[in-house]
């Protein structure tokens, strides 16, 4: 059995980690970064880009670059009015579900998420040197049942068996407390990421991580702060020039990148200049956007967002029944906790400095890896007791929601309650399963409905229908209803409201595998073309340097093989390029042998490769790419 990796599938960035012995390790991706942008792009020539490659081309390809897909996962089309309004890509209604439309094809949010998960899976496989099939994936603590199930589906599509869905603040607490198993602490984990906000109160001691309460807002995160800056810039430019940049997808994408950059800069500076030359043009000529944004102004335009942070904190502390003065540490998680105003709010609310000892971008993935180690048996003496974030119940007479399991109940858990019929001679009942905190059924989220039939006719109130709720360790719900008189039972596993069928998931898995093969083939083609290009370059260079030293009777064969390889490189297949390389190498090696009889000379095969190139394992020459990074840019 291989390793169980831990994946933080974030709104803005994703991260993967794995246990190496007793220590968790965050894995660098192929670009050398420890986090990967949660972005997927489809290019005009049909290529699919994931991560940094997708982010790099977003400005020139905004309508085909998908970001913040996590905000659509497990949600109906009519549940995401604000999200679809600000997305530059098309979000369409397909049978009530929110789907992304790229060209003529629609993708479910689970499919797009699976593409990001595949990238994380490949990153782990490259690091470990073995296949990875199992993972622990994190979700916001305040994700509902539908969103959790949809995340599991995304894992399946990516070719992963999701061993556990774990709440992000709980994962962070695991990472924070792993080396503190002998001490006892009460900890608040404050997790403000790219798209969601969670606050959890936990008690840590003797290897037990017990969640006392959790609360949050799945519509509050770094994206929302970015949007405030985007709107501010667009409004200011409209005042100055009379042009609304929000109507231009490319200009809007430039505003988005500038807004995110400005937000980051204002964490360490009190003001920043946003300078976007040639943002648009009129008959009078090009227009440039130059606006100065101060930290005070940023805090002013985001005042309503900062205010929204405190309410979940108040509820979480109240529901935990832990006095504020007994909370030992406030651990900051998520990139948005770097905002100075957020840190000040946390300090004012809890009355103490927040703990910044963990890396806010990586700690959740580290915790997921630790949970993977627990499941594998590699990490011992750790017990995780999580809670369900929202109350669960059914609709009863009068449209009332009757709760069976209250919010912040430790999971896994099971609860049964007996109900009866509402009418005389009623032979069937509908069980309408709900999640939420409101009194009326219509104000809560519907998780599913099912019917229990063949109830013997009887006066109302006489039949006894036992309804059982069972929440597993992933926080996913199973419901059953049983007629106690006949023993007849009906059960349902509550799936996501945007549930994909098994057939759809299998098809998506096959598509994902096919894309993985395509990506592998494309990389092989690029590698061999690069090798051929390097061989052509070094051969021409040697021909120029050696000149008349090359025997005249050998020159036609070299020139012929060189031209043949050039033609194959331009128009040929992988096979013809490989054949051309072998032929040129063979001809050159014969010439090199003659030359070496006279005096040693460098050559493409036998001598030193030109500077900036390196020999491949097969003897071919690869280009070595270098990137110069300014010291200020390297963070």
UniProtKB/Swiss-Prot annotation:
The keyword Lyase does not apply. Residues 624-635 have a biased composition (Acidic residues). Gene3D superfamilies: 1.20.1270.10, 3.30.420.40, Actin, Chain A, domain 4, Substrate Binding Domain Of DNAk, Chain A, domain 1. It comes from the Bacteria. CDD domains: ASKHA_NBD_HSP70_DnaK-like (cd10234). Keywords: ATP-binding, Chaperone, Nucleotide-binding, Phosphoprotein, Stress response. Disulfide bonds: none annotated. InterPro entries: ATPase_NBD, Chaperone_DnaK, Heat_shock_70_CS, HSP70_C_sf, HSP70_peptide-bd_sf, Hsp_70_fam. Residues 594-635 are annotated as: Disordered. The modification Phosphothreonine is found at residue 196. Induction: By stress conditions e.g. heat shock. GO terms for molecular function: ATP binding; ATP-dependent protein folding chaperone; unfolded protein binding. Belongs to the heat shock protein 70 family. Acts as a chaperone. This is Chaperone protein DnaK.
